[in-house]
From Swiss-Prot:
Protein modification: The N-terminus is blocked.
Gene name in the database record: l-1
Protein's cellular compartments: Secreted
InterPro entries cross-referenced by the UniProt entry: ConA-like_dom_sf, Galectin-like, Galectin_CRD
Expressing tissues: Skin; highest expression in that of individuals showing resistance to infectious disease.
Glycosylation sites: N130
Keywords: Glycoprotein, Hemagglutinin, Lectin, Secreted
PROSITE patterns documented for this protein: GALECTIN (PS51304)
Transmembrane residue ranges: none
This protein's name: Galactose-binding lectin l-1
């Protein structure tokens, strides 16, 4: 599994992280993570093609004190092995809005409660082609 990290790229309320990539031909999983460190993750977007007992599942979670918390499972799975994808994460201070490739949106509470995050990392079976953090072009609660 590949691991890519970006440090000191500030993500504040009203900002959007756009991730463009291509999934491997036979992926198990790929995750997008925003937080303070690998032990303190505000939002963990985990695309599971076939991981443990999960098949075609979107899992959203957060990690506090190096312990995963209660996960949010989403039955939507607009991802295809071997294909390009774009996922956007919009930070709205109290929530994260995750824009999926098919235009649907998943919502997740900002459980850590911070006003900004400076650590973004990606893990798994995809090649990240481009990332950007900018003022959101989608509706936010700025």
């Amino acid at each position: 599994m590949d691991f890519v990290e970006v440090k000191n790229l500030i993500m504040k309320s009203g900002m959007e992280l756009k991730v463009n990539g291509v999934f491997n031909a036979n992926p198990e999983r790929f995750s997008i993570n925003v937080g303070h460190s690998t032990e303190e993750i505000a939002v963990h977007v985990d695309v599971r093609f076939s991981y443990l007992s999960d098949k075609r599942q979107l899992i959203i979670n957060h990690k506090t004190g190096d312990a995963w918390q209660e996960e949010q499972r989403d039955a939507r799975f607009p991802f295809t092995a071997g294909q390009a994808f774009q996922v956007s994460v919009v930070f709205n201070f109290d929530t994260f809005d995750i824009y999926l490739p098919d235009g649907q949106v998943a919502h997740f509470t900002n459980h850590l409660g911070a006003q900004e995050y400076k650590y973004i990392f990606f893990v798994g079976d995809a090649t990240v082609k481009n990332i950007s953090v900018n003022v959101a072009d989608k509706p936010t609660k700025r």
